[in-house]
């Protein structure tokens, strides 16, 4: 798993 994917996976907030 790349760091970008990990970062996206760590996003726990909902976009507007």
From Swiss-Prot:
This protein is involved in the attenuation mechanism for the control of the expression of the his operon structural genes. One of its GO terms (biological process) is L-histidine biosynthetic process. Pfam families: His_leader (PF08047). Belongs to the HisL family. The gene is hisL. This is his operon leader peptide. The lineage of its organism: Bacteria, Pseudomonadati, Pseudomonadota, Gammaproteobacteria, Enterobacterales. Keywords: Amino-acid biosynthesis, Histidine biosynthesis, Leader peptide.
């Amino acid at each position: 798993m790349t760091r970008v994917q990990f970062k996206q996976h760590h996003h726990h907030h909902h976009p507007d």
